Swiss-Prot record:
Signal peptide: none
Family: Belongs to the universal ribosomal protein uS12 family.
Presequence boundaries: 1-29
Compartment(s) of residence: Mitochondrion
Encoding gene, per UniProt annotation: Mrps12
Organism from which the protein derives: Mus musculus
Mitochondrion among keywords: yes
Keywords: Mitochondrion, Ribonucleoprotein, Ribosomal protein, Transit peptide
Gene Ontology cellular component list: mitochondrial inner membrane; mitochondrial small ribosomal subunit; mitochondrion
Name of the protein in its database record: Small ribosomal subunit protein uS12m
Protein's UniProt keywords contain Transmembrane helix: no
Protein's GO biological process: mitochondrial translation
Subunit comment: Component of the mitochondrial ribosome small subunit (28S) which comprises a 12S rRNA and about 30 distinct proteins.
Coiled-coil annotated residue ranges, if any: none
């Protein structure tokens, strides 16, 4: 917006009692003392943390491995595992890559990042760390 436009909007809004104020003055007015007393101090909304609670990775123990079916247009079987995280929570994690040797009681490193076609799966197992080996090269 240009300066002449702002000045024109200001003069017209002042002459008409702020009825046609530009967006510059469209914010809400200040709260009254009664409203501030009733509502109390402003509360910061809590930060929305993902399943790793703000950490980049978490260590976990595999409870069981299983296969999940993806959502509608896709048809492959996705390898997943149930993991007890170091925070004490249990979560379902996707195992990326072809072929894995994960079994019960294996220790894995888990990172955030959802699998788009698996509803409710928001974590991935990191390959090549702890008991989860690297993806093997095809021969």
């Amino acid at each position: 917006m240009s300066w002449p436009g702002l000045l024109y909007g200001l003069t017209t809004s002042l002459s008409r009692g702020l009825a046609l104020a530009p967006q510059l003055w469209a914010a809400r007015s200040m709260a009254t003392l009664n409203q501030m007393h009733r509502l109390g101090p402003r509360k910061e909304p809590p930060k929305r943390l993902g399943p790793t609670e703000g950490r980049p990775q978490l260590k976990g123990v595999v409870l069981r491995t299983f296969i999940r079916k993806p959502k509608k247009p896709n048809s492959a079987n996705r390898k997943c595992c149930r993991v007890r995280l170091s925070t004490g929570k249990e979560a379902v994690c996707f195992i990326p890559g072809e072929g894995h040797t994960l079994q019960e009681h294996h220790v894995v490193l888990v990172e955030g990042g959802r699998t788009q076609d698996l509803p409710g799966v928001k974590l991935k197992v990191v390959r090549g760390k702890y008991d989860c080996g690297h993806v093997q090269k095809k021969k």
